[in-house]
Amino acid sequence: MNSSRAVSLSTDDVAGTAKVSARGVIDWFAPVVPDSRVAIFRTICYLFVILDMHLIVRDPISLSRHPELYRPLMLERLFQLPPPSLPLTMALYVILLFGCLVAAANRCPKTAGYLVAASFTWWTAIGISYGKVDHDHLALIVALWVLPTVGSIPGRWDSRVRSAQAGWALKCVQIAVVSTYFLSAVTKIRSGGWSLTSWPESSILMWAVVRRPNGLGQFLMPYPELLHLMQWFAFTAELCSLVVLWLRGRALLLAALFWLSFHVFTVAVLYIHFAPTLICWLAFAPLERFRPWLNGVIADWRQRTGRRAARQTVPIFRDQAVDGSG
């Protein structure tokens, strides 16, 4: 009797522990966050895509004039996408431009969102099918695919609703942001014959500085030991980047500032930016606080402007000026 009761209690404990563990995993992958955070993040992402297609991946239209240089990526081969042509790239450009404007206003979030996601994925694939394959767009493309899953948000920026659906979408973007760094480290290990020391012990940074003698980099060329140390630092930071996914509060803020500084430094040394990834770091931020802060700034400005206008002197014909405040 006692033995069967003990077995029953043990089974209940195991089931309870499993349920708690499953709930913890679900809460981590799909935390309940304000929907307004997604609404604001959507606006930022879609407006950035317009900038991206004009300033970063801006050459698919011109590249489509040279079909002999086209080397399709695995994605394009897998879906048997047609080779780029001038009409095709122009159509993608128009679809992206109007689709982003609609989606940035949080209108037709699923229709416009998926249309932009598919078009920009194809646009970016075309842009990197003629040369070097960059990895700075990973998080942005993931964001474009998961943001439409949240659907319509009543009140948009001013929404007071909280949902796990919004949390899941943002968590996917966060994982993609961190994966950009971690997978970069894995690629370095793989390219070095699966050796942890091959890439950081190489002279790749010196080669990059010699190849791009710009900005701060040209002043670092006489110091190969420092460049060598910087390689180890960057490689170690990329390997440890997964920790960011479990940080909260001030620790998360410090991590975000660290990676922001990291990218500022790469711009200063090599003129290489990671703007699409940096935009997606906003998936970690409490963006729902932006609207109240903006409303407060506008209210303060209006109040100060109103006081100034009230204190201005008002000239009266054939009389001395009087104070408009009373």
Which role fits each region the language model picked out?
Residues N2-G326:
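Alpha-helical membrane-anchoring segments
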